[in-house]
């Protein structure tokens, strides 16, 4: 059964579970400020094609390491809430954390249809690094489309990786397209295909199909978000990110998600610490796709999270945070060796 076939079951079970938690009145996140990073230092970085990218950062500007977090499809930077919250305490002044909204997401600007590509997202990440972290060592952390973004940057800028990147985390992502599996297979629908053509050919009539397309796409993304019972507040939070993403943006990125191929980038990551993490209940990017990518990274730490859905960093934040702490420890060792003139994997 494909993802669309699961929707009725998942939605019914999900509603029942959420109602059970609500009746118990013990939602652990009832009073959680899930938009914590709205109070962090903010700036706007202009992408190479003029699209404004919203950036937030926390930690000393002169920290020896900058960790750049890149969010996924139909999300925004606050999807890293639990990492921003916990890792600031864990890493202290040794790491500056940088977060940004990808083009067409969150508070960043709307892109043209032609620029909704993994290639362009890699260029956007490069622009963010040039603007806010032009010097020093980097750890790059990406979830879903954010992981693809990091691989795109790696292919485009192997010099940057060689000289400055000392660690990479790839969460719930893949190096190859999703046309035949996961999201691509689940959204193989003539209505969505027609809307995609309309966006390019007749932007003025796009409004007519927005509701229909959202009704097809949103349930797919919602059902795949979590593999276990989670806080109703968390469900509402992730759903708000999906709902706040323009349908035009959602559809315009589908083709690049289906067809991208960044396998060539993996060879540039074999000599630095890498963490690959995935949930075995992820229907957006199936476990097999993530593990296939990991095979090209024999020294990577592979963390398989039982029962986790696609939003592993929200569903199992403690496991993700622990993996990132381990990555930073390995990356710090690489930094020390590079500073002493020796190069090699940590």
Give residue spans per PLM region.
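An N-terminal hydrophobic leader/cap segment in hydrolases
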Residues: 2-44
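Conserved HGGG/HGGXW glycine-rich cap/lid loop of the alpha/beta-hydrolase fold
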Residues: 51, 56-110, 131
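Active-site glycine-rich loops that stabilize anionic/oxyanionic intermediates
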Residues: 72-76, 143-145, 174
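Active-site loop/oxyanion-hole signature of alpha/beta-hydrolase fold enzymes
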Residues: 95-148, 155, 159-161, 322
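Flexible "cap/lid" loop of the alpha/beta hydrolase fold
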Residues: 155, 159-204
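Conserved alpha/beta-hydrolase catalytic His-Asp/Glu region
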Residues: 203-268
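Catalytic active-site module of serine/aspartate enzymes centered on a nucleophile-bearing elbow/loop
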Residues: 298-346
